Every structure is written in structure tokens, then in C-alpha cells.
Amino acid sequence: MPDDSRISPLDQARILSEALPHMQRYDEETIVIKYGGHAMGSENVARQFASDIVLLEQTAINPVVVHGGGPQIAAMLQRLGIKSEFAAGLRITDAATIEIVEMVLAGSINKQLVGYINEAGGKAVGLCGKDGNMVTAAKATRMLADPDSNIEKVVDLGFVGEPEKVDLTLLNQLIGHELIPVLAPLATSKGGQTFNVNADIFAGAVAGALKAKRLLLLTDVPGVLDKSKKLIPELSISDARKLIADGTISGGMIPKVETCIYALEQGVSGVVIIDGKTPHAVLLELFTNQGTGTLIHK
């Protein structure tokens, strides 16, 4: 983004004029934003993101932030000499690892982001899915093909969960009252066991329960790419499923798109996958005519 000092007053006025109808469209609407771990790697980017979230709240939008923390968890595990293992894109989380995951997500990252938002003039409240039994999860399982026999088998992911229920009681006490919920993707089972939940999946479940106007997934890529690696600006659910089937959408993008589809089917109006490293990515998507990333809709 260009330095504000290089933008003439007239251009600044035009920018604000372009933003107005978009602000009106999202007036008093809930926007769920998933902020990824890699995009959080720079303090400057994190502070800029926090400032943008405060701007949303100041324009009568109700932002709900869900953050990840994969790189930070990996760094802490490495420091403690614990090996990181993954299966089907999910971190295998044993008893020792879940304690570290909870410490990093609900402690370090969550409170740091809350601090940045508060320093920018907002009123952030740091929570995780365990608070108020907000998110109840069941143990996640995945099927993977054995590399030798090619026979599929169930992989034990440990304390990794998938949301079963979202209780909005606590969130509804915050949303619309000038408070910004900042959620760490941890959940609890009916028996009280803590589960690590993939942040995209967690955000999709929360957005679906809230019937959010938008779910924004901030990632490390510009959005969904075609086979020529060009950005696809817009997709319907049926388009997305076809691209998964023909291999255009592959690897780590598949669970993200599946989360988008789930959220849409639960009542979210639109989901956008955008590059979280782009300066002011959230504002570009919500407040400009062109937007950014890939919009997925029904």
C-alpha cells in the first residue's frame, strides 16, 4: 500500500467515498476473521491487522477473530525437544503436546493479539472454545492409505477434535457491545477433555453458528488458484467441488475450501480466502469494489 503522505486529499476523499456503500452493506453485521499463524509472524503485520479490526468495530461491524498458531507451536515444541508430527494436515497431539498447544494458543498468542487490539483503541476479550463451553468437540479421525499396501487405515491424531456444537451464550454477551472476541481454537469434549482444533475448521463452525455475513480465512496464498496458478476471484459451491474432483484444488487448500462449503451450508452469506500477508487485506476485501482473494458463495 502506498504511504498515506503520497496520497492527495482528493484521492483520500475518493477512497472514503468508495468505502461508504461497503460500510453500509456490513452495518451491524458479524464478520468472522480467521487470522493464520504464518501471517502473524511479523509484529508489524500483527499490529496492522489489530488496527484494521478496530476500524471494523468503529464502523458498526461486529468482528470476531479466530487465530491460529501453527508456527509458534512448532517453535515451542522444538525448543522443548518435542517432535512435531502431522497426518492429513493435522497436528498429531499427544498428552504432552496438548499442554504446550494450550499454553501457546490460549496464553501467549491470544493475549498478545488482545493486547495489540486494545493498544489500537479497541476492547478485545481473549477466549478459547473451552470458555463457557462455547465449542464442544469430538475426537477427530482421519483415514490414510498405507504407503506399502495402499490400504486405508484410521490414524490416531491424539487430542485433536472436530466441533460438534457451538454455544453462542457467551459470544452473544460480547457481540454488538463494542467488545471484540478473540478466540483460540481449543475446545472441550463432553467429558472435559481439551482438544486442539484446526483454526480454519474452528472459525467455520463459529461463523456457521453465528450465521455471519462473511467468513474471511487469512492464509499464505492469494486465494484459490487455477492450474495455471492464476487467482480465481469467485467460485460457487458446485464450482469448488468440481475443482477438488479434478485436482485443481489440492493439498492444504482442500480442507480450507471444505470449511468454506460447510460454513455456507450453515448459513454464512459468503466466505473469502485471502492472503493474510497483504497489507490491510481485510479492509481491501470488505471496503473496496475490487476486493481481494477468492469469494466462495452458494
Swiss-Prot record:
Positions annotated to bind substrate: 69-70, 91, 196
Gene3D superfamilies cross-referenced by the UniProt entry: Acetylglutamate kinase-like
Listed InterPro entries: AceGlu_kinase-like_sf (IPR036393), AcgluKinase_fam (IPR004662), ArgB (IPR037528), Asp/Glu/Uridylate_kinase (IPR001048), NAGK-C (IPR041727)
GO cellular component terms listed in the entry, alphabetical order: cytoplasm
Main localisation: cytoplasm
Ligase found in the keyword field: no
GO molecular function, one term: acetylglutamate kinase activity
Site residues by UniProt (Transition state stabilizer): 34, 256
Subcellular location as annotated: Cytoplasm
Chain's role: Catalyzes the ATP-dependent phosphorylation of N-acetyl-L-glutamate.
This protein's name: Acetylglutamate kinase
Organism (species): Nitrobacter winogradskyi (strain ATCC 25391 / DSM 10237 / CIP 104748 / NCIMB 11846 / Nb-255)
UniProt gene name: argB
